[in-house]
Curated annotation (Swiss-Prot):
Hydrolyzes the pyrophosphate bond of UDP-2,3-diacylglucosamine to yield 2,3-diacylglucosamine 1-phosphate (lipid X) and UMP by catalyzing the attack of water at the alpha-P atom. Involved in the biosynthesis of lipid A, a phosphorylated glycolipid that anchors the lipopolysaccharide to the outer membrane of the cell. Pathway: Glycolipid biosynthesis; lipid IV(A) biosynthesis; lipid IV(A) from (3R)-3-hydroxytetradecanoyl-[acyl-carrier-protein] and UDP-N-acetyl-alpha-D-glucosamine: step 4/6. Pfam families: Metallophos. This is UDP-2,3-diacylglucosamine hydrolase. Disulfide bonds: none annotated. Binds 2 Mn(2+) ions per subunit in a binuclear metal center. Its EC number is 3.6.1.54. It is a peripheral membrane protein. One of its GO terms (molecular function) is manganese ion binding. It catalyses: UDP-2-N,3-O-bis[(3R)-3-hydroxytetradecanoyl]-alpha-D-glucosamine + H2O = 2-N,3-O-bis[(3R)-3-hydroxytetradecanoyl]-alpha-D-glucosaminyl 1-phosphate + UMP + 2 H(+). Substrate binds at N79, R80, D122, S160, N164, K167, H195.
Length: 240
């Protein structure tokens, strides 16, 4: 048996192929796992659990079916879907996790997170992140009518895409010292995250000992997952 990790699907009604690929992944791969962990940016944006988007309902039903088949699903918020709350979690059968979580799987000790907190060189993004994760601001936003929330979300997304065009690749990637500090803070040999859309396994030397940072790819043209078994941790890219 295995444990699976995915991130950065950016599910949207405008990308039906990705949705179909994810549903096929649940039926053909996740169904055979011990557990499924989704490490953020599951949806392209999220304006509240009260959004009656049919896609959200379809995904919730598929995840609940997975849970009913004996495979639990766990979720860490990303920068696109940080407003997913207890209502959707209940409807989908997902368990919401904190922004960092240490797992003990067989002999592996693994830290999981979305990954945006590691990108400390991007000062503008970190300021934005601090604002939108403010609970008071979130409560105010969720009090707005859905139409206004949707308008704000689309405007923020457009602004983010425009801003990122002028940022260097290095700024939008993780900061090496932030990675080392995080490894030391949580005392793990492995870290798995998403966010940067740069699938790879990096070896990080800390005090003469190897540590491993696994990065999930985004589901743009193919699927990406980490598969953890008793004897290995592997990054797998696969067609939809």
């Amino acid at each position: 048996m295995c444990t699976l990790f995915i991130a950065d699907l950016h599910l949207s009604e405008h990308e039906p192929a990705i949705t179909a690929g994810f549903l096929r992944f649940l039926q053909e791969q996740a169904i055979h796992a011990n557990a499924l962990y989704i490490l953020g940016d599951f949806f392209d944006f999220w304006i509240g659990d009260d959004d009656p988007n049919p896609l959200h309902q379809r995904i919730a039903q598929a995840l609940m079916a997975l849970k009913n088949a004996g495979v639990p699903c766990y979720f860490i918020h990303g920068n696109r879907d940080f407003l997913i709350g207890s209502r959707f979690a209940k409807e989908s059968g997902m368990t919401l996790l904190p922004q960092e979580k240490v797992l003990e799987i067989e002999q592996h000790r693994i830290l999981i997170l979305h990954g945006d907190t590691l990108c400390t060189d991007d000062d503008a993004y970190q300021r934005y992140r601090k604002k939108v994760h403010n609970k008071f601001i979130q409560r105010l936003f969720l009090l707005l009518p859905l139409t206004i929330r949707l308008r704000i979300a689309k405007k923020m997304r457009s602004r983010s895409q425009s801003s990122n065009q002028y940022k260097s690749e290095a700024i939008m990637d993780v900061n090496a010292q932030a990675v080392i500090n995080t490894f030391k803070q949580f005392n793990t040999q492995w870290m798995i995250h998403g966010h940067t859309h740069r699938p790879a396994i990096h070896t990080v030397d800390i005090d003469g000992k190897p540590h491993y940072r696994g990065v999930l790819g985004a589901w743009h043209t193919e699927g990406s997952m980490f598969k953890v078994t008793s004897d290995k941790i592997e990054l797998i890219q696969f067609p939809f």
